[in-house]
Amino acid sequence: RHGTTFSFNGKTYCVINAGKPVCASGEPKTDIYVLAKSEDGEKIEVKISYKMQNADFIENKTNEERAEQLLGPDWKTHIIDATKSIKEKFDDRHLIYKKRFAHTAAGSITLGWKFELVNKQGGELSGKMDLTAEQVYAVYSGNNLPDNKKNSSVNGEIIANSGVADYILISDDVASADDVVSKMQPLDKYIEEHPDIYFACKALNYRTYQAKYDGNRPLAVQV
């Protein structure tokens, strides 16, 4: 918050603006925006993507627009190649559940599978994405998102590129601003250490006994 001091790269800075960037629809990649000023007048921006340690999703609402922004003009090819790589696993899935199975309710009918980007392989319908380093950086930073998400609002003020993250913080507990600085990593450094992004396909089921489903969701694989 305003007035908080912290040490960064050998200097002491005082926060002059801080908040969560927001946009009219959807979300930018930055979760924490900080503008700070040093004693000698130098201003810096710190834009952090923040995740809990058990959070595995990177993008969990992947629609056509978002996929193109994150994966580029060949987004369809990336998704098709990814899902085809586990075709046999889709073929082995039940489509109609007369009885409850694991987390799937009795009477469910699978309509298809949603596509999510995650930071670790998880579940049976999951695999590694074939992406360049630039594409991986775009997924984490949001540097290819539209202007209304890149130039987000912080405390009511539109700030250029406030929605594009430069750092990542993965922690369940931070005690102070200095604690945040000590635990955050530059995105390019983090990606050097964690170069892989994975996909996970989650079923969209129609629950016949309740006559309900999870709403209209884009499907990477449909029945």
Which residues does each predicted region cover?
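Short, positively charged
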Residues: 1-223
